[in-house]
Amino acid sequence: MLNDLKLSLQYILPKLWLTRLAGWGASKRAGWLTKLVIDLFVKYYKVDMKEAQKPDTAAYRTFNDFFVRPLRDDVRPLNTDPNVLVMPADGVISQLGAIEDDKILQAKGHDYSLEALLAGNYQMAGLFRNGSFATTYLSPRDYHRVHMPCNGILREMIYVPGDLFSVNHLTAQNVPNLFARNERVICLFDTEFGPMAQILVGATIVGSIETVWSGTVTPPREGIIKRWTWPAGDSEGSVALLKGQEMGRFKLGSTVINLFAPGQVKLVDSLQSLSVTKIGQPLATAVEASTAAEPAPLPEEEIRAEHRASPLVDDTQDQG
């Protein structure tokens, strides 16, 4: 009954209005009140401020400044093996695995359409049919900048307007085509591992999605699909990003989806739904790589804190 009510509210609540309100509040300078809100947020979500370049919460003029806080250079070591693709974000794995023709796993027993995720772009979808994917959810406690899994040349960016459903265990199980319905920014790269898409997906109260080459992509929310292209390789005007380099950020929320071409990479065997991710740790390896790569083990306390903060964890079950 309670879950039915929560799900109904996802359809009834004015999500766009709530998102605009949250974005407005998060951008305001409110002095002691801003610091109080940040302090309460840090305490509730157990945010590790020792990792931040500015660990003192008084250093942040707005909540948005705090939310996109940069980390110290030494806290996310980058796996430099050229055969290894690294995790693009801190968070937890929602799902990962094989793309079965046009089907991507959303939750156990629930798939969504690759082509729909890519806004009906059948040519782009053709690059990734029968490839592989990884979906990473960023909880409120996480660092909210998104980085490159490997070196890449940006070729295309598509802004897709859409719904702003929350991303959690309940919606993943019950909202069909959740990630193909929500607002998103699709970024297509040429890489040494073939084409790669990195998709930034919005949700309720995600105030904005930004990229390092275009700045703020949304808002404004104009309700139309927008597309930009860039030249290949060393051409004038091309955009090249290095493995581990920041490529975008969220101001509140949400989810990153990576798509890889068939026969190019192998996802790390130990990764599964609810695995905790840290930027720079192994996500996948080149198929011809002779050695396997594994993420560094994390303290149990960190894993528990991440799971407590993640709405992907089914809170109707005992998580231990």
Curated annotation (Swiss-Prot):
Name of this chain's protein: Phosphatidylserine decarboxylase proenzyme
Protein family per UniProt: Belongs to the phosphatidylserine decarboxylase family. PSD-B subfamily. Prokaryotic type I sub-subfamily.
Lineage: Bacteria, Pseudomonadati, Pseudomonadota, Gammaproteobacteria, Enterobacterales
Binding note for cofactor: Binds 1 pyruvoyl group covalently per subunit.
Cell compartments where the protein resides: Cell membrane
One GO location term (cellular component): plasma membrane
Modification after translation, per record: Is synthesized initially as an inactive proenzyme. Formation of the active enzyme involves a self-maturation process in which the active site pyruvoyl group is generated from an internal serine residue via an autocatalytic post-translational modification. Two non-identical subunits are generated from the proenzyme in this reaction, and the pyruvate is formed at the N-terminus of the alpha chain, which is derived from the carboxyl end of the proenzyme.
Ranges for region Disordered: 288-320
Biological pathway: Phospholipid metabolism; phosphatidylethanolamine biosynthesis; phosphatidylethanolamine from CDP-diacylglycerol: step 2/2
Natural source organism: Klebsiella pneumoniae (strain 342)
Cofactor(s) needed: pyruvate
Major site of localization recorded for this protein: membrane
Chain positions with Pyruvic acid (Ser) modification: 254
Pfam families documented for this protein: PS_Dcarbxylase (PF02666)
Principal EC category: lyase
Origin superkingdom: Bacteria
InterPro entries recorded: PS_Dcarbxylase, PSD-B, PSD_type1_pro
